[in-house]
Amino acid sequence: MVNFFQIALVLIGSTGIINHVIIIPMLLDHSGRDSWISIIILSLVYIIWIPCVFIVHKYTREEHLFSWLMRNYGGFITYPLLSIIVLYLIILGTVTLKETLTFFSFYLPETPRILLGVLLSIICFYNIQRGVQSIALTTGILLPVVFLLGFFVMIANFPHKDYSLLKPIMEHGMDPVIKGMIYPAAGFVELIFILFLQHHIGSKIKLSQLIIVGIILAGITLGPTIAAIVEFGPFVAANQRYPTFEEWRLVSIGKYIEHLDFLSVYQWLVGVFIRISLVIFLIPDVLQVTKQKARNQIISILLICMVIICILPISDASFYWFLSHVFLPISAIGLFLFSMLLLVFVWVSKNKKRA
């Protein structure tokens, strides 16, 4: 068992890699200069949605979510939902690994992608098979350094920031603002993972704690988005594949120390390590596979399949289109609808017991 603080760090580290890095170019593509407004408006909606997650947690009584569904609604409802969640988690892990191999191709262009994929998979496998405690402990050790580096790059780049680039506000009306909201939403709704992990949490979860995690997730999305706009301008930032990490290229210490962007590699690796470990751990966990040998076999097969898919000759443009137009919008809408469905199930179950 782990406590809520540890799980919160895992969720922040996992969701941070998508909201801090992956969604920002797509958000800038659709909302441009007003991307930061999209995040602020969405964050207000997000704070309203978080109590829905808490209500589901409260009335499932810290039981395994899918055990609760099976007990109350049977396999006819539970198995289709479980299948969709498992498929979503597999795609999520594959997308994360694919993005990682693309990012590392900038730094290690001559290194075979399969080698990088296998090395990362081996490290993640070792972490996953040791359980949620291992994932939580490694996150607690690695993530604070990521936060420190984030504050460092923010402070170091103050001389390069021009906040006048945030204006004019809503030059093209509300339409671009609304279009961009779907991308940070894809990361925000991953807070629902707390329900998949609730049977591993030994401490009581409070609504205020979930709201604090939500505010942190909103902050780590808003900060780099504003930074990209004020440092590069909305048009240049939108043309960059990873504007968050391009910010590291601006960092220098005095006259003689620069090219510190290698530190971004640590940030990325930590985020990906946490995210892949969490996502792949959840698959046998939601399937309630208890035997360690069977769990290890499932984890191994999943990681091997992910590496094979990631080294297929798929262009980055096609992959970017898939993320932007298919996966992220479906993820955001799908997880939101899933949370609403759980809320309905909880309400019906509660009224049945009263009757």
From Swiss-Prot:
Q: Does the keyword Lyase belong to this entry?
A: no
* Compartment(s) where it occurs, according to its Swiss-Prot or TrEMBL record: Cell membrane
TM regions (residue ranges): 2-24, 34-56, 69-91, 106-128, 135-157, 180-197, 210-232, 265-287, 299-321, 326-348
The superkingdom of the source organism is Bacteria
Mind telling me which Pfam families this protein's record contains? Spore_permease
Gene Ontology terms describing biological process: amino acid transport; spore germination
How does the protein associate with the membrane? Answer: Multi-pass membrane protein
Coiled coil feature spans: none
**Cellular component, GO annotation:** plasma membrane
Please give the chief subcellular localization of this protein.
membrane
Family matches, as InterPro entries: Spore_GerAB
Asked whether the keyword Transferase is assigned, the reply is no
For this UniProt record, the keywords arranged alphabetically read as follows: Amino-acid transport, Cell membrane, Germination, Membrane, Plasmid, Transmembrane, Transmembrane helix, Transport, Virulence
The family note in this entry says: Belongs to the amino acid-polyamine-organocation (APC) superfamily. Spore germination protein (SGP) (TC 2.A.3.9) family.
What does the record give as the function of this protein? May allow B.anthracis to germinate within phagocytic cells and therefore involved in virulence.
Q: What is this protein called?
A: Spore germination protein XB
What gene makes this protein? gerXB
